[in-house]
Amino acid sequence: MSDLVAGDTQPKRKIDWLALGLFALGGLAAVSLIGTGLSTAIYGGFGFLQQVSSSQGVLSGLNYILAGGLLLVAAFLALLQLMGRSAPRLLAPRSGRKRAPHLLVLALPLIWVAGHTVSQTDAAWLLLPSLHMLAVGFPLLWLIWLAKREFPHIKPLRRWGALGSGLALSPFLAVILEFVAGILFFLAGMLYLSFSPEMLFNLERLFTRLSWGNPSMETLTRILEPFASDAVLAVLFVGFFAVAVPFIEELVKPAAVLLLLRRPITVREGFVLGAISGAGFGLLENLTQGASTEGWAPLVVARLGTTAVHMITAGLTGAALVEARDRQQYGRLIAAYLTAVLLHGLWNAMAVLPVLAELSDAYPRHLVITPWMVLALLGAGSVILIAAINRRLRPVGVAGEPESG
């Protein structure tokens, strides 16, 4: 009887709700992405059999499958956590110094040249997806290494959970909020147009031309020129991408760190997990928005800077979140968030200004070239900042500390 009573009073293991959420939502997102990727890739494959241009469809499909596969790893680790099992050795961190993965970066020029060459051929649908994954994955691995080098180890579940958050949770929240913001900016633009009969006529002409079918780029540029030349519409256009979008995305990107604030977590972990979450956010953009054979190489190179910016901004906010929790002071958190918004906003502004300059002669010609120089400086500066903050937060004389739970 005493044994029975003792057995009944044994404490039950508490449910790890974060792991449960990662397993359920991450698994659902993974299945959705893989399903979308398979259907897109198969459709592209049929296009090839029918001698129709299919490279972009196959590339997009395989990219979705890759993103879904990464989420499956995160969901699998969450399942192991729920079952009380350890992560496989392949995914578990190892102690000791690791060789810097600089060869990954040194291989990039060869990958870019090969990808550019392949993208001009009929074999692009078959060969470009693999080169695209290497061109996106190699710098991502190097940047993550740069953010966490010589730091105490972090459990695989946390690292992969942060990546999964950046791949699924943060983009999902961002899309909802940006949709609402987009409606508000659109309504503001329509309200402004309602006071200008001439602009309303131009808008009607645009809709009429679009209803006829896909216009040529020259025709579309000519129709959009009055809108691009209008100062108020230009401010709304740039304001959405350079103000509203950064405020929203920098709010949701460190979601992984925010969810861990009720658990033991250090400022170093906040920076690394924030950076990894930003890497996931940038990876999803690279895999979806860079899935084109037209201008493949320049687009892939440009999006490397985007990933670095996403990582440094989310890393800054992630570290500041943990510090604010520890000190119960929020001045640095606000400063870090506004700095992240400023960096992201400047990047987006430099990316959209050339669009206006291409559409209208009302803007100086240097707006076509100068922003790209600023983008290059921002991308390089973000990489330097990642390394500098890592060095500043790096513990002295640490060979390997226990993993955080």
For the regions a protein language model found, what residue spans apply to each?
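Hydrophobic alpha-helical segments at protein termini of multi-pass membrane proteins
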Residues: 1-405
